[in-house]
């Protein structure tokens, strides 16, 4: 497959054996780039992965949402948008189809400004991180997304949690890979399990990880 651009029109060409498929790209920049992210921490969570993870939990805003290792705030922002039923691409600056000859700007503006599908969010999203720099970045992204009213942030290590808002769900993406040693990683998950057992009673917890031994350290199964 290949891609070419002719006067702002992106054409995808895919050749397989004797078949050739031509398609016009109506999106432009990848749709996983929502448009609200103005800065990011090291190894930020992909926006689509964050949204998919939240949707997998079944949560749609019927309780508080907590991310105690929030980094640049992606899970918090996607959670608030899901709770409010805000269209995920609403913050994008442009789409490729806006440069098409038959682009209907009036129709696009009418659809873009239609908020009839949005809903109230009676609870709140709470985020924290051990890093002041991460919280500063998350704050900028949340402000860019226009969600300051729905998300609370603070600099706070997970192990310092002594209470949790009720009712609630916890969804988080702990540090991994080169950012943390194997020994510290297992210690981190042991601490996560301890906090879940003593502070987040009654919660459902969804944690993104890549090692089964990490979940073993949580010790809830």
Predicted region positions:
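Class I S-adenosyl-L-methionine
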Residues: 14-56
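Conserved S-adenosyl-L-methionine
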Residues: 45, 49-162, 178
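Short, small-residue-biased leader/transition segments that mark boundaries at the very start
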Residues: 1-6
């Amino acid at each position: 497959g290949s891609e070419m651009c002719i006067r702002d029109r992106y054409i995808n060409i895919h050749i397989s054996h004797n078949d050739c498929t031509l398609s016009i790209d109506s999106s432009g920049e990848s749709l996983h780039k929502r448009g609200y992210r103005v800065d990011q921490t090291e190894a930020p969570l992909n926006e689509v992965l964050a949204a998919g993870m939240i949707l997998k939990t079944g949560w749609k805003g019927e309780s508080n949402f907590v991310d105690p290792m929030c980094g640049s705030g992606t899970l918090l922002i996607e959670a608030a948008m899901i709770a409010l039923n805000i269209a995920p691409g609403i913050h994008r600056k442009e789409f490729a189809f806006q440069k098409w000859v038959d682009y209907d700007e009036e129709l696009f503006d009418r659809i873009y400004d239609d908020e009839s599908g949005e809903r109230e969010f009676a609870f709140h999203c709470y985020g924290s991180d051990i890093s002041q720099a991460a919280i500063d970045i998350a704050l900028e992204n949340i402000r860019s997304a226009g969600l300051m009213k729905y998300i609370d942030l603070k600099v706070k290590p997970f192990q310092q949690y002594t209470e949790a808002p009720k009712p609630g769900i916890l969804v988080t993406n702990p540090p991994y890979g080169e950012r943390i040693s194997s020994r510290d990683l297992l210690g981190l998950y042991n601490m996560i399990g301890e906090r879940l057992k003593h502070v987040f009673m009654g919660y459902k917890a969804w944690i993104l990880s890549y090692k089964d031994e990490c979940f073993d350290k949580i010790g809830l199964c």
